[in-house]
């Protein structure tokens, strides 16, 4: 999948908004994932709850969104930028790579709910970006 210059511009602009709202948006997206796909809770057995208000959900959601925000500044070299995360999720945590796509869908919904200007252009750019991120995070499985 190739990001156009228009896609890259939209994603880079979105990166700052994601960073500024990392905890709230990350918790929301993660809570959506747990509600829609309860099987994903198995990777978080130490969590005391799975709602967006749970401190563990907030902390992990913030970590994920900050990683995504950082990735928006490395669009031309996502593979190298996400290599350590891919290894961690693939070799240590043994996360089913399909879950990256499930989570991406939840992130799109969270962004659409929270961004007033979530235009079709932005939606397309975000979909492409998250698809590339999911692909790179799955690289240790190939």
Curated annotation (Swiss-Prot):
Keywords: Heme, Iron, Metal-binding, Oxygen transport, Transport. Residues 2-142 form the Globin domain. Heme b binds at residue 89. GO terms for molecular function: haptoglobin binding; heme binding; metal ion binding; organic acid binding; oxygen binding; oxygen carrier activity; peroxidase activity. InterPro entries: Globin, Globin-like_sf, Globin/Proto, Hemoglobin_a-typ, Hemoglobin_oxygen_transport. Red blood cells. GO terms for biological process: hydrogen peroxide catabolic process. PANTHER family: HEMOGLOBIN FAMILY MEMBER. Involved in oxygen transport from gills to the various peripheral tissues. Belongs to the globin family. This is Hemoglobin subunit alpha. The gene is hba.
